[in-house]
C-alpha cells in the first residue's frame, strides 16, 4: 500500500518504495500538495515527483537509478561536428536561465514517443519556477538567430544536478544544450547527474544505472557541498570537440 502524505507528513523510508514485481516499481508515496518545501525535501532525499493531470502527486525513488557521470559523456562524430559549427557561427548561442518557464512549457508541449499528454503540468511548472527563483533550478537553452530552439532544465543543490526534461525545435538543439551543461559540470568537477529513468537515448550518451543505495549516499554528500556557479556560454563546448569523445547513435529523449 502506497502511503498518503498529509501536508505535515514526512516521506517514508525509500526502502518502502514499490519493488520490481509491482506495476509501479519505485513508487514511494502520494500526496495532494506540491509545495516548494516538499519538493526541496524530496530532492535532498533522492526522491522526485512524476504524475499526470488528474492524478495525485506521485513520489518516486526507483532502484536502480539512472545517472550520467559528466566525465563519461559520449559525443558522436555528428554531434562533435555540430558543436564545432555552433562555436564558429555567431548566430548560435547557449544561454543559461534566460527563459526558464519558457523552457518548461516547451518541454511540456514536446511530443514523446509512447506517451500521451504530459507530466509537466501547470502545477509542476509553478513549483519548479519557485525553485528557479530561489536559485535551485536552472535552464540551459540553445538559441539560433535570436530564437530559443531547444533546451533543458533541472534542479541543483550543492554539487548535484538532477536532470528533468529537454526539448528541441530543430535538430540537435537539445543535444547542444546538454553538451554545454556537461562541459560546464566537467569544469566544476561535478561527479553525477541524476537522470531518474533508463532510456536508450541516455544510455547512448554514457548514462548507466547504479543501485539506489549508492545513489542516495552520493546525493547526501553532494548536496551538502557549496553550490557551483551557473554562468557560462557556448565557449564551454570547445572542450567536447576532441575526437577522443565517441558515442553510439542516439534514441529517444525524456
From Swiss-Prot:
Annotated disulfide bonds: none
Annotated GO MF terms: leucyl-tRNA--protein transferase activity
Gene Ontology cellular component annotations, sorted alphabetically: cytoplasm
InterPro entries: Acyl_CoA_acyltransferase (IPR016181), Leu/Phe-tRNA_Trfase (IPR004616), Leu/Phe-tRNA_Trfase_C (IPR042203), Leu/Phe-tRNA_Trfase_N (IPR042221)
Reaction catalysed by this enzyme: N-terminal L-lysyl-[protein] + L-leucyl-tRNA(Leu) = N-terminal L-leucyl-L-lysyl-[protein] + tRNA(Leu) + H(+); N-terminal L-arginyl-[protein] + L-leucyl-tRNA(Leu) = N-terminal L-leucyl-L-arginyl-[protein] + tRNA(Leu) + H(+); L-phenylalanyl-tRNA(Phe) + an N-terminal L-alpha-aminoacyl-[protein] = an N-terminal L-phenylalanyl-L-alpha-aminoacyl-[protein] + tRNA(Phe)
Top-level EC class: transferase
Keywords for the protein's UniProt record, in alphabetical order: Acyltransferase, Cytoplasm, Transferase
Any matching Pfam family: Leu_Phe_trans
Primary location class: cytoplasm
Signal peptide coordinates: none
BP GO annotations: protein catabolic process
EC number assigned by the record: 2.3.2.6
Compartment annotation: Cytoplasm
HAMAP family reported in the protein's UniProt record: Leu_Phe_trans (MF_00688)
Similarity field: Belongs to the L/F-transferase family.
Role according to the record: Functions in the N-end rule pathway of protein degradation where it conjugates Leu, Phe and, less efficiently, Met from aminoacyl-tRNAs to the N-termini of proteins containing an N-terminal arginine or lysine.
Protein name: Leucyl/phenylalanyl-tRNA--protein transferase
Amino acid at each position: 500500500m502506497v502511503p498518503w502524505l498529509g501536508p505535515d507528513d514526512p516521506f517514508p523510508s525509500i526502502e518502502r518504495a514499490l519493488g520490481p514485481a509491482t506495476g509501479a516499481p519505485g513508487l514511494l508515496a502520494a500526496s495532494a500538495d506540491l509545495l516548494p518545501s516538499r519538493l526541496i525535501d524530496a530532492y535532498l532525499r533522492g526522491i522526485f515527483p512524476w504524475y499526470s493531470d488528474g492524478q495525485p502527486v506521485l513520489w518516486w525513488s526507483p532502484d536502480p537509478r539512472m545517472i550520467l557521470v559528466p566525465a563519461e559523456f559520449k559525443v558522436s562524430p555528428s554531434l562533435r561536428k555540430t558543436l564545432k559549427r555552433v562555436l564558429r557561427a555567431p548566430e548560435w548561442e547557449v544561454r543559461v536561465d534566460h527563459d526558464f518557464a519558457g523552457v518548461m512549457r516547451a518541454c511540456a508541449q514536446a511530443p514523446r514517443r509512447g506517451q500521451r499528454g504530459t507530466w509537466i503540468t501547470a502545477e509542476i511548472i509553478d513549483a519548479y519556477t519557485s525553485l528557479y527563483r530561489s536559485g535551485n533550478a536552472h535552464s540551459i537553452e540553445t538559441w539560433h538567430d535570436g530564437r530559443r530552439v531547444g533546451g533543458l532544465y533541472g534542479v541543483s543543490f550543492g554539487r548535484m544536478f538532477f536532470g528533468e526534461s529537454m526539448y528541441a525545435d530543430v535538430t540537435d538543439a537539445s543535444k547542444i544544450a546538454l553538451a554545454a551543461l556537461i562541459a560546464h559540470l566537467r569544469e566544476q568537477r561535478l561527479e553525477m547527474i541524476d537522470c531518474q529513468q533508463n532510456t536508450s537515448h541516455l544510455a547512448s550518451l554514457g548514462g548507466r544505472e547504479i543501485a539506489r543505495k549508492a545513489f542516495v549516499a552520493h546525493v547526501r554528500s553532494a548536496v551538502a557541498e557549496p553550490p557551483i556557479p551557473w554562468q557560462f556560454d557556448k565557449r564551454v563546448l570547445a572542450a567536447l570537440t576532441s575526437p577522443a569523445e565517441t558515442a553510439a547513435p542516439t534514441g529517444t529523449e525524456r
